[in-house]
Structure formats: C-alpha cells, structure tokens
Amino acid sequence: MSLSVEQEEQKYWEEVEAVKQWWKDSRWRYTKRPFTAEQIVAKRGNLKIEYPSNVQSKKLWKLVEEKFKTKTASFTYGCLDPTMVTQMVKYLDTVYVSGWQSSSTASSTDEPSPDLADYPMNTVPNKVNQLWMAQLFHDRKQREERLRNPKEKRASLANIDYLAPIIADADTGHGGLTAVMKLTKLFIERGAAGIHIEDQAPGTKKCGHMAGKVLVPISEHINRLVAIRAQADIMGTDLLAIARTDSEAATLITSTIDPRDHAFVVGSTNPNLEPLNDLMIAAERAGKNGAELQAIEDSWTAKAGLKRFEDAVIDQIKASSAANKQAAIDAFLREIKGKSNKEARAIARQILGTDIFWDWDAPRTREGYYRYQGGCQCAINRAVAFAPFADLIWMESKLPDYAQAKEFAEGVHAVWPQQKLAYNLSPSFNWKAAMPRDEQETYIRRLGELGYCWQFITLAGLHTTALISDQFAKAYAKQGMRAYGELVQEPEMENKVDVVTHQKWSGANYVDELLKMVTGGVSSTSAMGKGVTEDQFK
C-alpha cells in the first residue's frame, strides 16, 4: 500500500536527518561530500536494505584507524579461491581480491587475459562473492561445531575469525561515472568492505607495472571517488574508497583541462618542427608503415626538445644575461606553484621580458593524448587533491624504494597529516635484487611507521599456487604417490592444516547436523557416518 503524501514527506525528512547524523560520525571527519543528504535520500527506494558488507566496512575502518594510530600495518595478499581464504584468515586480518588475478584466472567469460581490465565488470565482484560466501559458510560451520560441544571443551577447538574484511580491485571503474556507481553497487552487494580505483583512462588501462599508462585529469578521478561515495551513501554503507595513482610512471594524459595537471605536461621547445601527428599522417599517406613510422617519430622526438614548461623557463633563465640567475629561478618556481600554464606563462614573461616557445599540442600522440612527466612529486600532487575524497591513498611504484615511499608519505602528510596510505608489495619487484633479507623482513614495519597502514602482495595467491603446483607435478611424475605423501599429506598433518580432513573442512559434519535437525535426530545417510575414510586420520 502506497504512503500518503504526508507520510512520504515525513519519512523523507526523517531519513534526511538520519543521514546527517550518520555523516557527523568520526568515521567521516576527513571526508568531503559535494552533495547533500537530501540528494542522497531522494535516490533511495522505499525498502531499506541492510547490507552485510557494511559490517565488514566498519570492521575494516576500525582496523586501519588503529593501525595508522599505532604506526603499524595490516598486511595481506591476493586470494585466489575459497580454500586459500580459509587458510589466510588464520593469520591475516584482511583479504585482497586482485583484478590481475581475476583477469588471468576468473573472468566471467572464462577467457584469460593480462591485466588490461578488459574483462566484464562483474568479474571481480563475482570473485568477491565467491570468497564472501565461503567466509560465511566456514564461520557457520565453525560456530555449529563449537556450540555442539560443552563449554569446557571449546577452548581446545578452533576459533578462527573467518570474516576478515575483503578489499577489492575496481580498476578504473569500467567506464563513465554511472558505470563506477554500478560497479560500486555490485561490490557492496557481493561483500566487499573496501575497493580501490586508479587514475588511469579506462580504455587504455594497464597493470601498474606495465608501460604505456594514460592518466585522466585529476578532476575526472575525483569524480570517480565522489561517485563511489555517493553510491555507498545511497546504500547506507561505510564502504572504504582507496584512491590509487599511477602517475609515478605515467607518460601520457588524456586532457589538460585541469590546471592542477599543467605543471607535469610536456611540450615541444622547437618552433621549427611541425606537430608530430601532422607529420605521421603525411608519412602514412606516403605509404610508410611499421619501422619507418617509428623512425620518423623517434627523429621528431629527438629534435623536439621535450620538457615541462617550468624546465623550459629555467633553461631560458640560465641562458639569459640575468645578473642573479638562481634568484630569478627561485622566484619563478615560488610564484608558479599551484598555477595554471596560462598563469605560469605570464609570470615567466615578467621575469624574462619575453614569451618563450613551448607547445604542449605539438607532441600529442595519434590518439590525441598529451605527453606527461610523472614521478613521485607528480604523485604527491595528485594524492593531495584526492585526499578529501579517499579513505586511503596508494601510489603505484616501479620498485620497493623506501626513500621514495618516505618522500611520498611526507609530501602527502605535509598537507593532510591524517591521511592513511596503502602500499603494493608487488611480486613484479625483484625482491632479492632490491634489498637484503633482513631489510625484506622489516620492510612492512618500516612502511607502517610512515603511515602505510594497509599493505598487500597483489599476486601472492597466484605465485604460491603456481609454485606448489609445479613442485608437486614434477615430483608426482617421477615418484608417484610418494610425492603426494611427502610434499602434501605429511606436511598437512605435521602443520595441522585443516584441509587434510577435507570432508570435515568442506562442511560434511555441518550438513549431517542439518539433516539430523530436520529428520528428528537420526539420518541413515549421514556423510560422516560409519565407513567414512577420514577415520584414518584420527
């Protein structure tokens, strides 16, 4: 039965007030929302739905708050499947779901791919759902077993927190802002406590450790973060939004529309060259292709004098007859901080007395992208802009470089001292070459002291599965069942890995108890009754 207009109005304003009170919670003390409670409530339906993932989001927020406060870290790795998640939660307090792993092993089309985010947008949410359902099941199974035993025996029984919060990879959002909102909705419905989204362009997205990354303007990525928060607010959840920036190694950007990006855009300083794209089009029309086109581009690039505007001005000052060149450079750098290119040009004109040639359109690629010079300071610039809209911030990096991680953390915290940071302990890094083992052992702790309160190995699930599969298959081919005993079953028993009794692990006892409950206490078809082979392991 429909509400009357008066009832509808009263319910609306009650919800608006409830949302305003919710936003006053300390959880949101650093969060900026460019929309109102009235707008959020108007986008909700009449039926209030309580999402279980909200419990997980609250749990995750409490965890990272405590870790940041104590300068420690929660650390985890990318989980492949339900078996893995049940082993991870014994020792780790969060679970990560990687887009890379999902792309290679779990696309909803079953078509493997490298990490280009070209799989259907429900791929990673589906993996989250698989792990979340497993967490819920094993939690039920464990609770039933414990409550089936008297209190005095429970201390000796497993009491694992299976419900470790899941943080998942949202790539670039798989499209425009409505796609970001739909993806966020999927993640909340499927059990994610938090998601991360990166500032790459969706059609050209690459793994964080591949070349050819194209960024979107700062404002566009902020819109994505706002879209995530708006969708979570509509659904009434505390979902954590993690902003990832790939700007440390980026070389291209889609647009120069945001002045905050201007300082890192690269232009040509050679007025005698025609624009690169015009040259390439003419060469193609002349029948050139492949290596010939590449040679033309390489030659143009070598002659173009590509550099950022501030570097071009500094070079001009150094070449000028100014009495105190360093003072002029210092004044220029001080005055252009935070300014657009138009404003920076005016400042340069005042110092040099003339305009300099610098053209950011001339080097544009055939796709229309602008050249861009990334780096740690570039990433700091973006992180500072993202901070009011993100719960954590992550800079993707090429190496496990502590000095760089420190530079980034200090740069962000100089503006936003309470900003929580995340760090990818990537398997793309050669850890043996990067640092000695004693430093490897302390790396997570040292990063935690800098504010990196959540850290993760994206693909450890993939690599550990590949390693044991290779070791076992090789030994099995040579030794037969001896390999299974020595490499798998005996170590399982020695380490008390619960999967050694896989029927019990899978919930056979739990299901037997369900059957007994509905059949009055007796079942002649109990899975774990007389004859079950797991009696051999008692």
Curated annotation (Swiss-Prot):
Residues reported in the UniProt entry to bind Mg(2+): 169
Major enzyme class: lyase
Binding site for substrate: 98-100, 208-209, 244, 424-428, 458
Enzyme Commission number(s) from the entry: 4.1.3.1, 4.1.3.30
InterPro entries per UniProt: Isocitrate_lyase (IPR006254), Isocitrate_lyase_ph_CS (IPR018523), Pyrv/PenolPyrv_kinase-like_dom (IPR015813), Pyrv_kinase-like_dom_sf (IPR040442)
GO BP, one annotated term: glyoxylate cycle
Catalytic function, reaction form: D-threo-isocitrate = glyoxylate + succinate; (2S,3R)-3-hydroxybutane-1,2,3-tricarboxylate = pyruvate + succinate
Catalytic residues (positions): 207 (proton acceptor)
Gene3D superfamilies documented for this protein: 1.10.10.850, Phosphoenolpyruvate-binding domains (3.20.20.60)
One Pfam family named in its UniProt record: ICL
Reported cofactor(s): Mg(2+)
Compartment annotation: Glyoxysome
Keywords: Glyoxylate bypass, Glyoxysome, Lyase, Magnesium, Metal-binding, Peroxisome, Tricarboxylic acid cycle
Pathway: Carbohydrate metabolism; glyoxylate cycle; (S)-malate from isocitrate: step 1/2
Role summary: Catalyzes the formation of succinate and glyoxylate from isocitrate, a key step of the glyoxylate cycle, which operates as an anaplerotic route for replenishing the tricarboxylic acid cycle. Required for growth on ethanol or acetate, but dispensable when fermentable carbon sources are available. Also acts on 2-methylisocitrate.
Family: Belongs to the isocitrate lyase/PEP mutase superfamily. Isocitrate lyase family.
Protein name according to UniProt: Isocitrate lyase
